[in-house]
A protein has these predicted regions:
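Bacterial N-terminal signal peptides that target proteins for export
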Residues: 2-14
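N-terminal secretory/targeting leader peptides
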Residues: 14, 30-123, 147-383
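Sec/Tat signal peptide C-region and signal peptidase I cleavage site
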Residues: 23-29
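Short, solvent-exposed loop/beta-turn-alpha elements that line the ligand-binding surface or hinge
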Residues: 119-143
Length: 383
């Protein structure tokens, strides 16, 4: 190839690359923008789910130019039950929901809630393959006109936070404890505590003023309340609480989108946001345990119960959660409570600790995300 031919080939390659860029930009410009309000009961960054919601906003606004995604954290627009009703009525586009909290509008959503069922990371990561989840997706679609894309992970180390250490059932007795939902109330009741449900955004002032003595929450929740509840106790993976996020959209809104809009949003949620959320949640658990773990239960920090201590909680709780769920749902739901327990046991057996790809996540590479987005500050209430 002579100099002239080489120059011509180079110019052709540059032109082709330019056309590719222009074509991609043109394709993006052809996509109709969307306006999405997404309601959540969790707090914003650095909470891992809050970071994931912020990533969702960034990706939608980048891939669908002209779009606007408005994030409503900590129940600032709707709490989860009201958000579901708003989606059913066509008054809200999307919700980052939670199964246990959704039970207030559909008791069936409780069938996947319960401690010491999914007790390995790999088992939790296989949740979307469960027949129970597919049943709930179908039910939400038919009964509430809500499309659930998939599930997300709460902290695998859900636990109990307080101003003093809660380890034995006796430590819980008489304590006013914030619960995440009615299913957890049954567990707390079995331990002798006085449970109350409230949105997470209301928790810090309630702790500070003594309205509650402690709370059930995630490690992300502990990180937000460690000044008010510095003693956080966990009983292994899902040892005290077992609940999960779901991400859904109003069919009333979703069905008005064209196929290209739906494909882009579905790809963002399924292929990018949900896998990212599970990884950053895993890494958040790891970094917080690494930073705040204490082996001395008399000192503040994250204390992981030994087998005997966790066993005492499990014995005291008994079948309280499953019994409560069965008592509050139609008889037809009982089979799904039992089905989920069987699916969970099979998933744990198939995914022992250390075997999942999730546990191989490079958390050093994920560290930057904890400072990527502006730290969330709860808006001050107007006087």
């Amino acid at each position: 190839m002579n100099l002239a031919q080489g120059k011509k080939a180079l110019l052709s390659a540059v032109a082709a690359a330019a056309l590719t860029v222009v074509g991609a930009a043109s394709a993006m410009a052809d996509v109709k923008p969307v306006t999405i309000r997404i309601a959540a009961d969790l707090t914003g960054p650095p909470h891992p789910a809050g970071i994931s919601m912020s990533l969702f906003k960034e990706l939608v606004e980048k891939k669908m130019p002209g779009s606007e995604v408005r994030l409503f954290f900590a129940g600032s627009l709707y709490r989860i039950p009201e958000a579901v009703e708003a989606m059913t009525d066509g008054n809200l586009e999307m919700t980052w929901g939670q199964f246990g909290k959704t039970a207030a509008v559909d008791p069936y959503m409780n069938v996947v809630v319960g401690a010491q069922l999914l007790t390995t990371p790999g088992a939790i990561d296989s949740l979307d393959s469960f027949e129970t989840i597919k049943f709930l997706q179908d039910r939400m679609n038919k009964v509430h006109d809500v499309h659930i894309f998939g599930s997300g992970h709460l902290s695998m180390y859900m636990g109990a936070g307080s101003g003093s250490r809660l380890i034995s059932p006796a430590d819980f007795k008489g304590k006013k404890m914030r619960s995440m939902g009615p299913a957890e109330n049954a567990l707390l009741g079995a331990l002798g505590a006085n449970p109350t449900t409230m949105a997470f955004g209301d928790v810090p002032p309630a702790l500070q003023t003594g309205v509650i003595d402690g709370l059930l929450t995630s490690l992300g929740g502990f990180n937000s309340t460690k000044d008010q509840a510095p003693f956080f106790t966990i009983a292994g993976i899902n040892g005290i609480v077992g609940d999960y996020y779901w991400i859904g959209a109003s069919n009333s809104w979703w069905n008005k989108l064209d196929t290209e809009q739906q494909a882009i949003l579905n790809g963002i949620i399924i292929n990018e946001v949900l896998p990212f959320q599970k990884k950053i949640n895993f890494c958040n658990d790891k970094r917080l345990v690494d930073k705040y773990e204490t082996k001395d239960p008399s000192k503040p920090g994250i204390y992981i119960m030994n087998a005997a201590e966790a066993g005492a909680i499990k014995t005291a709780a008994g079948t309280a959660t499953a019994d409560w769920i069965k008592s509050k749902t139609p008889d037809a739901a009982n089979m799904w409570v039992d089905k989920f327990a069987m699916e969970a046991a099979a998933a744990v057996a198939a995914n022992p600790v250390g075997s999942s790809d999730l546990e191989k996540t490079d958390c050093a590479a994920m560290a930057k995300w904890f400072t990527t987005y502006e730290r969330y500050k709860k808006p001050k209430k107007k006087k």
